[in-house]
Amino acid sequence: MCIRDSIYSVIIGKSFSSSSLGFYNQAHKMQTVPSEAIRSIIMTASYPIIANEKNPNKRYDLYLSVFSKFTFIVSAMVFLLMAVSDFAFYALLGEKWIPAAPLFSIFILITLTFPQKVVNANIIKIQGDSALYRNLSLLDTVLRIIALLVTMTYSLEMIVVGQVVAAFISAYTYTACCGKRIGFSTKKQYRIWYSIMWKPLAAFFVSKVILSFFKMGYWGDMFSAVFFLVVLCSLCELTKDHTYINLKTIYITYLKKLCK
């Protein structure tokens, strides 16, 4: 990861100014911190549970459960962070870093591919196929370097879009190569992914449209976040989203234990 990022920085540094490279690196860093934290937590919590389950049917159900919950958490986080990106950069880094916020809003879309990559990587790691895991990781790096070389003559925004496209192609490859081993087909994975992801996406657009009628500057992002959460929860309640209800039950149970 560090070597790959260094290659990106060198190539971008040769084509753009040092300030543009700084905005790119800062946007990437802001995307990486929350995304990797979520991925690490999910992998640490789910891997031993799934690996210790010997019944194939129960293991399949665990994969399905982890995939659904992971997708909901990640998609909600991604679109919430997109909603507050300007304010986050302004509050955490200062006004001079605001130009990095649009790059971050594109970069963070890469995180939407994490459920496919993490769950499918777990499938082959538990099966002990280290060669396939290594090849898929290498393919991911190659795809992103190719995307960078193709887009480097354009704008920084196009470079980041290229990285997002490469990440989605890589995620599709993970689903095609790994999921079929346990009957968790690519079609089924993306059907679940879309059925969950459209709600946070809709909540994001609704919150942005509502706030577009008001001029509140960076602080408007905070109201956008509130609208986003209200709309998302309302959509999930109206559609009786099973993943949302399950996560809500887990959260309420956890709070009750804390209050005892």
Spans of model-derived segments:
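Short runs within selected transmembrane alpha-helices of multi-pass transporters and secretion channels
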Residues: D5, H28, M43, P102-L148, ...
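Interfacial/gating helices of multi-pass transporter permease domains
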Residues: I11-T32, D61-L62, I98-F104
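Membrane-water interface segments that mark the loop-to-transmembrane alpha-helix transition
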Residues: P56-M77, L136, R191-I196
